[in-house]
Curated annotation (Swiss-Prot):
Gene Ontology cellular component terms for the protein in this record: cytosol
Annotated compartments: Cytoplasm
Organism: Wigglesworthia glossinidia brevipalpis
UniProt record similarity statement: Belongs to the DapA family.
Protein name, entry field: 4-hydroxy-tetrahydrodipicolinate synthase
Catalyzed reactions per annotation: L-aspartate 4-semialdehyde + pyruvate = (2S,4S)-4-hydroxy-2,3,4,5-tetrahydrodipicolinate + H2O + H(+)
Cross-referenced SUPFAM superfamilies: Aldolase (SSF51569)
UniProt keyword annotations, A-Z: Amino-acid biosynthesis, Cytoplasm, Diaminopimelate biosynthesis, Lyase, Lysine biosynthesis, Schiff base
Amino acid sequence: MFTGSIVALITPMKKSGKIDFDSIKGLIEYHIVNNTSAILAIGTTGENFSLTFEEQCNIVKYIFETCDKKIPVIAGIISSNIENIKKQINFYNKINISGILISTPYYSCPTQNGIFNYFKEISKNTDIPQIIYNNPKRTGCDILPETVSKLSYIKNIIGIKDSSKDLSRVKKIKFFSKKNFCLLCGDDINILDFMQLGGCGVISTAANIIAYESSSLCRLINNRHYYKAEKLYYNILDLYKILLIAPNPTPIKWACNFLGLIKTKYIRLPMIGLNKKEIFMFKKILNKIKLKSKINCI
């Protein structure tokens, strides 16, 4: 169902710390112009962890209404409280978004059987297509390929965003899961290998500033134009690397502000901005790479 370049959209904020909805509108226009496949709202890159429940709902509703069916919208859910998740899903059921991305439960250290029943229980509360989000570094919880494959046979669980960095899992999940189960790369830097092994797309942080390049790269790989894909990948590889200079979303928010996509680089605590050395290194990379994305569209 979901393929190609899905942007993990940042959440722009004013200097006061309030949500900057005008900048969100500009970002949506930027992604429509540059052929982004879908928008993931309030994921890790969207600072889900620092937003109130009310803010999360307002942001998703605004993005959904602004997109006006021109581009699919997926909402991120990061929680370990299943009742809070049900409450959030109930809101998303009312606005009929295209998908929900749900992380594995953090901190609680569940067994694989516990993880299976967790996602199974959540799936009973909605018909919205559900994507599992595996990011063991962030959550301390790792869903194994065998568990993913079992979950793939639940009707509305349609894919996984995998940020485990273990590329050997891609073929295992693809082989044992139901047909057309969607494997989405969760780390930009691994996109080339991940998709060549059977992935259908990427949920991309970098796409916030290289929407055109990211969508082009996915299209080239899916069409098996591997030489052109590798050429494009290695042209933007340094950008993928520099985005790892500090915890996400600090680097990408700075870059969006530097390139004029958002008005401020404000980020909520406990995240903090880049230091002078990191900014110098980032500017050097941005000056080196010739971006084709239509940034002046907003």
